[in-house]
Design a protein with these regions (language model features):
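Transmembrane helical cores of multi-pass secondary ion antiporters/exchangers
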Residues: 1-431
């Protein structure tokens, strides 16, 4: 009960100062990670007795599913259709190059890892974190086209990483994952079923919520509970059919808007807050785990972490964005702000649950921890200054620059819209991809 009491007390204190904290460079993940690190010495006995990777996995999975669903439900579908080429580039060329380059660098930095173990490490660290990137995607100072692209990328790349991760685990273990016949079949199950589950739950759930609201069957408080049940339903059904719960949650969040347009403006706030609570709990637990393993963090882990956050992320993004006419400032901004956090923690726990005691297991675990830890601080502390610098850079661009083309027609946010969000009505201005 001591860790829970400390966490809840910190959560309450942080909520009292949250508006002030949002005006600083110290983010909530930094606060709760540091708190976990500071509390570890007093909780060592408790952690050894009761802290398990399986328990942390469930907390992290639920937190990430909630966050992905709420992010997707707040994504403007009109703008999404206009920027489809940017997320497609980041999720295809960008992600594949990130996994390949990450594996190559891992083999160079950690020669003791096999090729497949290097692939495991790369797949765990390939996805970006929607939670750590919230400051970016919620800032009206960042062009809509850029932040929506980063939001969609973060929402989908963790789910897309899962098949690669489990395939590398299967190859490293020299056997087929779960008896499935091929990588193609497994990808179809994870991604294809994930999309189908998300579409079914999102469309049906949105239609039923809208029907209940129009018929005045549903109370406002239970309208919120109805929305929060949808991402949890995505999680449960995905687990039952062997689909990616992360893909299902994000697709479900997009689909729910079709039948229930108010999902992203009002009711989703309940789901978002609970998702945020779970995310902060994960960072708190991660901070304790990081201190526990700190003596094992060698120089190679720090070198790989630095390369993973810079070269391994930024070079593939730059290649993927060739031909978009985006400025160098935008390419660098999108390349740098691909933080590693909750998604990598979840995938790391999936790996620890699935792994067959590979020789490089500890090397992979420590490298993931160091990379996430470095990202929490580096991306958190650089977010506000980075937005300010980027804002000045794009202000000097011509009016027809690709960065500006989706921000031509903007209105004041309607009642109920969260602070930092804007509403784009429609923009018929064409842009080059």
């Amino acid at each position: 009960m001591i860790p829970l009491a400390f966490f809840v007390s910190l959560l309450f204190l942080y909520s009292l100062l949250s508006r002030r904290m949002e005006q600083t460079i110290v983010t909530a993940p930094i606060v709760f990670t540091v708190a976990g690190m500071l509390m570890f010495p007093a909780l060592q006995g408790i952690l050894k007795a009761g802290f398990t990777a399986n328990a942390a996995l469930h907390v992290a999975e639920v937190g990430l599913v909630m966050l992905l669903f709420t992010d997707a439900s707040r994504t403007d579908l009109k703008v999404l259709r206009s920027i489809k080429t940017l997320p497609a580039r980041l999720l295809s060329t960008g992600m594949l190059l990130t996994i390949v380059l990450g594996a190559v660098v891992a083999r160079l930095v950690f020669p003791q890892l096999s090729l497949w173990e290097a692939g495991i490490l790369s797949a765990i660290l390939a996805p970006t974190d929607a939670g750590l990137g919230q400051i970016i995607v919620n800032s009206p100072r960042v062009p809509m086209r850029i932040r929506q692209a980063l939001n969609v990328e973060a929402g989908l790349n963790d789910g897309l990483s899962v098949p690669f991760l489990l395939f590398f685990i299967a190859m490293a273990a020299a056997k087929i994952v779960g008896g499935r016949g091929s990588l193609v079949e497994f990808i179809v199950e994870q991604l294809g079923f994930g999309v189908l589950v998300g579409l079914a739950i999102g469309l049906a759930g949105g239609w039923l919520l809208d029907l209940a609201r129009r018929k005045e069957w549903i109370a406002e408080s239970f309208e919120q509970i109805g929305v929060v049940a949808l991402p949890l339903l995505c999680l449960v059904v995905s687990d039952m059919v062997g689909a990616s719960m992360f893909i299902a949650a994000f697709v479900g969040g997009l689909a729910v808007q079709i039948g229930f347009k108010e999902a992203g403006k009002h009711s989703v706030e309940f789901a978002e807050e609970w998702g945020q609570l779970l995310n902060l709990a994960v960072f708190f637990l991660f901070g304790m785990a990081a201190v526990r393993d700190w003596p094992h963090f060698g120089a190679a882990s720090w070198i790989y972490a630095l390369l993973s956050l810079t070269l391994v992320r930024m070079l593939p993004v730059a290649i993927a964005l060739i031909g978009t006419r985006l400025s160098a400032a935008s390419v660098i901004f999108m390349g740098w702000f691909g933080p590693r956090g909750l998604a990598s923690i979840v995938l790391g726990l999936v790996y620890l649950e699935q792994q067959a005691h590979f020789p490089g297991e500890s090397t992979i675990r420590f490298a993931v921890q160091v990379t996430v830890l470095l990202s929490i601080f580096a991306h958190g502390l650089s977010a506000m200054p980075g937005i300010g610098l980027y804002e000045r850079k794009i202000a000097a661009l011509p009016a027809d620059a690709p960065e500006h083309l989706n921000d031509q027609i903007v209105t004041a946010a309607p009642a109920g819209t969260r602070e930092g969000e804007i509403q784009v009505l429609d923009s018929t201005v064409p842009f080059s991809t």
